[in-house]
């Protein structure tokens, strides 16, 4: 699809630096959960919250698809590890070590903001709104594993979706 092709081309565009003897670390990011500078939820989480706050949140599509994610603390932690370890190079998946289903993720989101997760958004509605991107970003789901980060000894600060969402929403979210 478009997204996979774009990522592949983007990553390939960095290959020539290796011929110059420059270490190349490619970070593949899952949707990042974090806060903005003012302490309010930002990024993907900011987009997911409004329906939940209006008591109409729920899974996207069937809810069975995997929903990979990562916490901003782990994005910065992984980047710091790669900067500090000249022996590491190549491609790294920046995602939580366990990927929940979309239903599990939205249940955790509802719980963290004290709202139900009961109203699914049907796939045809998402496709009508987002076209091909609905399938690529939200409906097909991916289940990457941060194996290379873990092998390098990285310890995730937010490995669990429930505690990660609570950390972002209980205090100031």
Please give the residue ranges for each predicted region:
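Alpha-helical membrane-targeting segments
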Residues: 38, 47-69, 111-141
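Conserved beta-loop-beta element that borders a ligand/cofactor-binding pocket
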Residues: 12-35
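Alpha-helical substrate-binding/gating segment
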Residues: 49-58, 64-99
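Mid/C-terminal beta-alpha module of Rossmann-like enzyme folds, strongest
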Residues: 78, 82-132, 166-173
């Amino acid at each position: 699809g478009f997204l996979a092709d774009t990522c592949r081309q983007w990553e390939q565009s960095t290959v020539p630096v290796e011929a110059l003897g420059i270490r190349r670390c490619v970070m593949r990011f899952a949707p990042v959960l974090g806060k903005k500078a003012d302490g309010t939820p930002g990024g993907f989480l900011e987009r997911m919250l409004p329906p939940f706050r209006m008591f109409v949140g729920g899974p996207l599509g069937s809810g069975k698809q995997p929903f990979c994610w990562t916490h901003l603390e782990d994005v910065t932690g992984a980047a710091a590890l790669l900067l500090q370890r000249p022996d590491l190079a190549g491609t790294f998946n920046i995602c939580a070590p366990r990927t929940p289903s979309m239903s599990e993720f939205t249940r955790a989101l509802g719980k963290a903001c004290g709202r139900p997760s009961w109203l699914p958004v049907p796939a045809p509605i998402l496709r009508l709104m987002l076209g091909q991107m609905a399938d690529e970003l939200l409906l097909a789901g991916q289940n990457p594993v941060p194996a290379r980060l873990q092998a390098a000894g990285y310890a995730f600060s937010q490995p669990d979706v429930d505690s990660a969402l609570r950390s972002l929403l209980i205090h100031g979210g």
